[in-house]
């Protein structure tokens, strides 16, 4: 079982790191006391091989040797990776001032600045035991996400789920689309009597549309557009991308184009799906 422990000073980006881990398929638990890790791993054994927890200053033992003992008592088959996130006092003070959140160590007699300094002192033992120390003072959430992915995967690339959805404008436009393309200007198989009862999934319709230079040029240009901007969408922490292709009835042109685009992006780097709204509705 792989276990990732994320610790660090409040405001340094632990929640961002945990969200990245969740996107990578980890079962995530926020602010779990260290003595409970063993019980958690035992409960998840066999059902979850990827587990991540965040630990804040309120759940840390006061003595270094207790911390070392707790980490050493993990099950022998545990593959542990640990992160400590930190930022300068000045940056943490600025972040708390902007968000107006209450610091975990804030008390009526303790100022925010004093709480930040105290937390740094209490977490110092943990900062010396971790595998990866990341200073987030000059990082935005995207830079931090990239660093965490780089360490865990050896790459900053994020697995993006791409949905190509065909639809018919006469049945209404989909509301969840990130990109929407109108293909009603393309040659229409509907006017070929032999093709009218078929769909864009059928070979005769596919052959008809594949012979149309305008259709091939359109598919090529959409492919290039998406290839150009996909890396930027991935860096924006996007998990899903829905590309809607619409024709009049959602039976021929949009179905064919969606299928062709799905095939071109099914290269193993992304999870790609083709969905045909009107065809699915007709079956229901």
UniProtKB/Swiss-Prot annotation:
Coiled-coil parts of chain: none
Note the InterPro entries from the entry: P-loop_NTPase, RapZ-like, RapZ-like_N, RapZ_C
Q: Which UniProt keywords apply?
A: ATP-binding, GTP-binding, Nucleotide-binding
Identify the residues that bind GTP. 56-59
One GO MF term, please?
A: ATP binding
Q: Is Iron-sulfur given among the entry's keywords?
A: no
Keyword Amino-acid biosynthesis attributed? no
| Superkingdom | Bacteria
User: What SUPFAM superfamilies does this protein's entry cite?
Assistant: P-loop containing nucleoside triphosphate hydrolases (SSF52540)
Q: Which residues bind ATP?
A: 8-15
Q: Which family does it belong to?
A: Belongs to the RapZ-like family.
Q: What does this protein do?
A: Displays ATPase and GTPase activities.
Q: What name is this protein filed under?
A: Nucleotide-binding protein Sbal_3671
């Amino acid at each position: 079982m792989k276990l990732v422990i994320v610790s660090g000073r409040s405001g340094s980006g632990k929640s961002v790191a945990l969200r990245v881990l969740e996107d990578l398929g980890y079962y995530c638990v926020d602010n779990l006391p260290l003595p409970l890790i063993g019980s958690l791993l035992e409960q998840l054994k066999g059902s979850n091989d990827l587990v991540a927890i965040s630990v804040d200053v309120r759940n840390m033992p006061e003595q270094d040797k207790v911390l070392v003992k707790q980490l050493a008592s993990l099950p022998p088959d545990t593959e542990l990776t640990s992160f400590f996130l930190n930022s300068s006092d000045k940056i943490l003070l600025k972040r708390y001032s902007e968000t107006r959140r209450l610091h975990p160590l804030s008390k009526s007699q303790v100022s925010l600045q004093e709480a930040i300094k105290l937390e740094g002192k209490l977490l110092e033992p943990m900062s010396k035991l971790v595998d990866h120390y990341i200073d987030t003072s000059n990082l935005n959430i995207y830079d931090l996400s990239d660093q965490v992915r780089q360490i865990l995967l050896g790459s900053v690339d994020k697995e993006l789920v791409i949905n190509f959805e065909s639809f018919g404008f006469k049945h209404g436009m989909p509301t969840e689309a990130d990109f929407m393309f109108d293909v009603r200007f393309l040659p229409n198989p509907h006017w070929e009597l032999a093709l009218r009862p078929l769909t864009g999934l059928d070979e005769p319709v596919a052959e008809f549309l594949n012979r149309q230079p305008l259709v091939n040029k359109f598919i090529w240009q959409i492919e290039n557009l998406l290839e150009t901007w996909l890396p930027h969408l991935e860096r924006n922490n996007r998990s899903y991308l829905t590309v809607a292709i619409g024709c009049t009835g959602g039976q021929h042109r949009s179905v064919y184009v969606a299928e062709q685009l799905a095939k071109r992006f099914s290269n193993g780097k992304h999870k790609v799906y083709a969905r045909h709204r009107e065809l699915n509705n007709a079956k229901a």
